Amino acid sequence: MTQVNQTKTSYGIFFNRHYPTIESACERWGLVYDANAEFELVFEDNILTLIKRDEPKLKGISVDFVSGAVAHRRKFGGGRGQSIAKAVGLKQGVNPSVVDGTAGLGRDAFVLASLGCNVTMVERHPVVAALLEDGLRRAYEDAEIGDWMRERMKLFHGSSIDSLADAAHSSNTEVDVVYLDPMYPHREKSALVKKEMRVFQSLVGADLDADGLLAPAMALASKRVVVKRPDYAEDLDGVKPSMVIATKKNRFDVYVRAAMTA
């Protein structure tokens, strides 16, 4: 796994400074101890978990590619018939390389990797990157999925806009698809928003610079750019997609640059 830390600014977080595993992770990701921080990182049952300190009843956030909802979706989620697979262009004999420019907790990236794509996740927030790294560590060690996870899922830490732009100017980078799922403000009242998502949003905030992602994504992707949006959201950067794949609450806006061929 390749991790590149392009973020020079430090981020304050509360953690047990006498726990070497957490201290090492925080040092690696530029996280500094802050006794008054809103969030805490803990390491329990071999899992790095984020807790919102002023809402202790809320479930902590961690990245788990081995069990739970993502494992169930991998086994029973519909395979290549899923909307995300159609949006990315997965079909018989075609396993596109994908850069997920807004990795978040890595769930969509994992779906694509489980279906055969080689996926590079880009995540700019150091706390989220630390959670992703820990999730990948456990997945890489898993007897069932470890082999293909090590081959297909990688993590890159840095600004999404800068990373996409830099990769687009590199002659060594070949990417079929860029996938984007920028954080969008929820229309519902906060009580209706999933508790985990509420904690996550309070950590990372809305992607106010999301419109700036489309141009470098289009420059990098050789085949298409896929943007996941809530059904009520406007087009990213005001640019109309080539086609739209709608789901119950979201849609995939697809910007086609070239045909997806084997």
UniProtKB/Swiss-Prot annotation:
S-adenosyl-L-methionine binds at R107, D108, E123, R124, S159, S160, D181. It comes from Shewanella woodyi (strain ATCC 51908 / MS32). This is Ribosomal RNA small subunit methyltransferase J. GO terms for cellular component: cytoplasm. Pfam families: SAM_MT. InterPro entries: 16SrRNA_methylTrfase_J, SAM-dependent_MTases_sf. It is an enzyme of class 2 (transferase). It catalyses: guanosine(1516) in 16S rRNA + S-adenosyl-L-methionine = N(2)-methylguanosine(1516) in 16S rRNA + S-adenosyl-L-homocysteine + H(+). Belongs to the methyltransferase superfamily. RsmJ family. Specifically methylates the guanosine in position 1516 of 16S rRNA. It comes from the Bacteria. Its EC number is 2.1.1.242. It is found in: Cytoplasm. Keywords: Cytoplasm, Methyltransferase, rRNA processing, S-adenosyl-L-methionine, Transferase. GO terms for molecular function: rRNA (guanine-N2-)-methyltransferase activity.
